[in-house]
């Protein structure tokens, strides 16, 4: 049972109080260049802009935001190419659990710590489900493995 009005989630009889964060729209995040944010993982040198839609058009300029996922709160899902002419997620394969991910937007910056790095099926979208916290999920292809995707997931730290 969820009670979003009081910004808490009820689960198994206990209440987990979530920090109140107003809902965010695309217009709140849209920059003059069309991007909605910037994702970076300094340890591996990954830094790229984020555009709405996990489309070839978006991923030719940076990372593509999965439209059904959170924009700033919840589970923010990002897709990107790692080879070819636009390898914005090329360094994702070097990420390790514990690395820090930053997501900078017009309304603020969130900082996350990587909790999962692994290969998932290209049909497995469960890592983009809402988990009751703020997290970011980055997904890219794996070279010569067309049925797999590399998934990096990080949970917000404050």
Regions found by a protein language model. Name each.
Residues 1-158:
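Solvent-exposed, non-transmembrane regions of membrane-associated and secreted proteins
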């Amino acid at each position: 049972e969820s009670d979003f009005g009081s910004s808490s989630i009820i689960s198994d009889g206990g209440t987990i109080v979530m920090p109140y964060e107003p809902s965010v729209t695309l217009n709140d995040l849209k920059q003059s260049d069309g991007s909605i944010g910037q994702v970076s993982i300094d340890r591996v040198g990954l830094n790229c802009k984020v555009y709405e839609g996990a489309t070839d058009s978006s991923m030719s300029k940076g990372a593509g935001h999965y439209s059904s996922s959170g924009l700033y709160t919840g589970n923010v899902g990002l897709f990107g190419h790692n080879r070819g002419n636009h390898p914005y997620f090329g360094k994702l394969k070097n990420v390790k659990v514990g690395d820090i991910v930053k997501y900078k937007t017009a309304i603020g910056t969130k900082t996350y710590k990587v909790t999962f790095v692994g290969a998932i099926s290209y049909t497995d979208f469960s890592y983009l489900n809402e988990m009751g916290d703020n997290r970011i999920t980055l997904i890219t292809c794996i070279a010569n493995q067309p049925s797999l995707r590399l998934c990096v997931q990080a949970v917000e730290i404050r």
